[in-house]
Structures are given as C-alpha cells and as structure tokens.
C-alpha cells in the first residue's frame, strides 16, 4: 500500500512538471502570448503571476478585472475556448504564470527573459571596422604632417589631440563589446562615435600646417560634418533595444570615406610652402 502511494505521488509530480511550459521573450517582442486552453469554462477564468492576480474574467457577467500593473492584458479568444493571455512588453514580468478556472489550474507557464544583442553581429562588426580604419587613417595623416613640417607648438598640439581621440575611441570600443544594451555598452558606443567631431579639428590643423586650406578641403570638411550629423542622428535612434543601426553605420562610413579623401589630398597635392627638415 505504501508503494502504491509513493507511486501515485511520483506520477502526480511528474504530471505537474511536464505540464509546465517555459517561454522565452526578449525586448524585441512588442507583445507576448502566454498559451492556455480551457474546454467549456464555467464561472470564471483567472490568470496569475506567481500569487498575484493579473486578469479575472467573469463568464456570467462578461466582465474583466485587470491588475493596475498589467493594464494591457487581455484574453485571446473566448469563443474558441482559447484563453491565452496577451500582454504588451511594458507590462511583462518574468515569473510563473498560471491559468485557472473554478475547477483548478489548467496551465502553468514559466516566462523567462532572454537578453539579446543591441545590434546584430553584422552591424557590430562594421562599426568596429569603420572606427578602426578611421583611426588608422587619422594616424597616417598626423604622421605625414609630422614628417612634412618642422616641429612646432601647433604640431605638438595636433599630435596630442590625435592621441586623445584615439584613446577615447579605443576605450569606447572595449566598453561596447559585446553589443549588449546596458549602461556600460551605451557609454562605450558614445565614446566610439561622439569624438568623431574632433577629427574635423585635426583635419583643419593638418591642412593649415601644410598650407593647403582650399575649396577642396572645405568640401571634405563639409562632407565629414554631414557624416557626423548622420552618426548623431543614428545614435539618437539607437538608444533602445532591437534597432536597425543602418543610419549610424552610414554616418561612420561617411566619416571613414572623408578620412580617405583627406589623406589622398595631403599626399597627392603637395604644398610649395612646406618646410622640410
């Protein structure tokens, strides 16, 4: 008799465990559907999160009582006995959700939040590539300027300024990787992108030291400024999870291309007013 009782307890426990479902959700989900089906529900249907009521539907009076913390909650389709809970992301909390009527619990669902990357892998890789190439071209510009003119205070300022920009963006890259949506990664992305405005200052310094400030240089500077504006706009649109980073990448790519043009102009159009060692 004792063995039979133990076996029954084991079977009941097994049934409860196997009837519990686990559903994962991410910040990319606008709404979450928690499934539950009740054949011919009688007096009421109730959804709970742990031991707190979320939604109670009275079949007799056709009324729904909602928790003040879950105002977006609603039932899927009462006519088809589908009483799945539909709830928006802003009201979702991880935990154990139970669906029951007056005869007892019908469904138990464990809701688990899964964290996703801020940007997809392709966009993240391009961000690092564009930033790395831009910094490399900046280094080449400063190096070319340094060997082309006699050392002066202005040249020293240019070199120090370039080193500071590189250090800030490299530190930002380390903070940003991997691209999760946390305060640390947001700060990292800001450090990677916002110092790009100072590249324009280094560019003006380089062309001024080499006596090459011309209309073409102004076009390059305006082009880079347009890239920076795109970057800032893309950054503003990216300060939330599950976004498309195309606009941000367009800005970073434009800045990288302008650095290419700057280096080509420095090398291919020598100034007759340069002072060599």
Curated annotation (Swiss-Prot):
The record's subcellular locations are: Host membrane
> From the Swiss-Prot or TrEMBL record, what is one GO molecular function term?
thrombospondin receptor activity
UniProt topology in membrane: Multi-pass membrane protein
Q: Where are the transmembrane segments?
A: 124-144, 156-176, 186-206, 219-239, 247-267
Cellular component aspect of the GO annotation: extracellular exosome; host cell membrane; plasma membrane
What does the UniProt keyword field contain? Answer: Glycoprotein, Host membrane, Membrane, Transmembrane, Transmembrane helix
User: One GO BP annotation here?
Assistant: positive regulation of phagocytosis
The organism's superkingdom is given as Viruses
* Glycan-modified residues: 29, 58
Keyword Electron transport annotated: no
Which Pfam families does the UniProt entry name for this protein?
CD47, V-set_CD47
What does this protein's UniProt record list under function? Promotes, when overexpressed, the influx of extracellular Ca(2+), leading to membrane permeability and host cell necrosis.
Record family assignment: Belongs to the orthopoxvirus OPG166 protein family.
Q: What is this protein called?
A: Protein OPG166
Species for this entry: Variola virus (isolate Human/India/Ind3/1967)
